[in-house]
Each structure stands twice: as C-alpha cells, then as structure tokens.
C-alpha cells in the first residue's frame, strides 16, 4: 500500500530509471495521474504533459467503464457495443464525454497539437482498472509515431497488465493484484486532486 500519490510516483520512477537520457515525454492522465507523472518527469529530467480520455459508462453505473473516448473522437470499447450505439442513452453519453474531454484539453493544454515523433512516451495514471482510458490513448498514440510507448502505473490488475503488454512496448507496475476492486484501496491517502493543482504542476513544465 502507498502512503499517497507522491510516494507512489517516486517509487515508480525508480523502476523507470533506465529511460533517463532518452528522448522522453511523460503523458499523464488527469487528475491523479498528473501527480504521479510529476514525480516521474522530475526524476528522469523530461517534460510532463497531459493526455485526456473519458470513461463511457452504462446507465446507472458511473464507476464502471465499458469504453472511453478522446477529444478527437477516438473510441475504445471493452466489449462489442455495436448493437447499442444508436440507443439514445449512448448517443448522449458519447457526445457528453467527448465534449468533457475537449473542455479539459482546452483548460489544461490550450490546444490539441502533440509532437510525439521519435519520442519515448511514458503514459501514466495513479492506477489502472479496466484499462479503458488507457487503451483508447494507446490507439491514439499509435497514429502519432512515437519511438516507444511505456505504460507505467503504481497498480494494475494482473489481467489488465497482460492485455496492456499486447498493445505497448513495455508495461511497468509496482503492484499487480489478482483481486482488484478500486484504485483507492491501494493508497492510505487518496484525496481528489483539484484542477488547480493539476494546472500548478503543469506550469512548472511550460
């Protein structure tokens, strides 16, 4: 169990030490992932940026992700959803989540231009559950020609870890639980990270 995100980020950065000196960029998923990414970027001496994806939820289950979407409309589904996509609920949910992703991208970055060519991209979050928000970013990253994609997170369920290994060059985790309920159970302190804190951290890398 980790004390908080800062401790988890420092411990994770030790596992990434061999990437120091490479042309690296840390891409963090807000908001908790930015605290982790800050520690990694400081340790490796590289830039920190954000990448936005939003969970798509089924009716009445706000915590359960069946997929995820990015500001440009890139979508990943955890299961075959083709028969449901024209239902009014999902049309509305997809539009809402895409708009939310666009708003957050504008707030934290100001634009959607990324220069990832020939870079080693370290994609990080404070924990990965189903992996929906990460898988959609991996799909998007593949179109942007990075040299290498490393997924790094303090905690990833063993089953998700095996799936991630198929879609990235390297996956680094400190904990690989076989039983997993929520990311928060692996932290003593898991307060919500404010948008102001995210903006403050990112300002140091501009």
Language-model features: locations:
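PRPP-associated nucleotide enzymes
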Residues: 1-206
């Amino acid at each position: 169990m980790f004390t908080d995100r800062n401790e988890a980020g420092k411990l994770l950065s030790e596992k990434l030490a061999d990437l120091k000196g490479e042309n690296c960029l840390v891409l963090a998923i807000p908001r908790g992932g930015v605290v982790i990414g800050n520690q990694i970027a400081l340790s490796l001496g590289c830039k920190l940026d954000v990448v936005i994806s939003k969970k798509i939820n089924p009716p009445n289950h706000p915590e359960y992700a069946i997929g995820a979407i990015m500001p440009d409309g890139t979508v990943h589904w955890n299961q075959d959803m083709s028969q449901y996509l024209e239902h009014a609920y999902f049309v509305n949910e997809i539009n809402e989540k895409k708009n939310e992703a666009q708003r957050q991208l504008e707030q934290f970055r100001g634009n959607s231009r990324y220069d990832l060519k020939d870079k080693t991209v370290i994609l990080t979050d404070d924990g990965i559950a189903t992996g929906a928000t990460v898988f959609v970013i991996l799909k998007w990253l593949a179109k942007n020609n990075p040299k290498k994609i490393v997924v790094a997170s303090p905690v990833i369920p063993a089953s998700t870890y095996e799936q991630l290994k198929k879609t990235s060059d390297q996956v680094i985790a400190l904990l690989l639980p076989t039983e997993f309920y929520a990311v928060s159970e692996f932290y003593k302190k898991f307060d919500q990270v404010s948008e102001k804190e995210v903006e403050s951290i990112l300002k140091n890398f501009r």
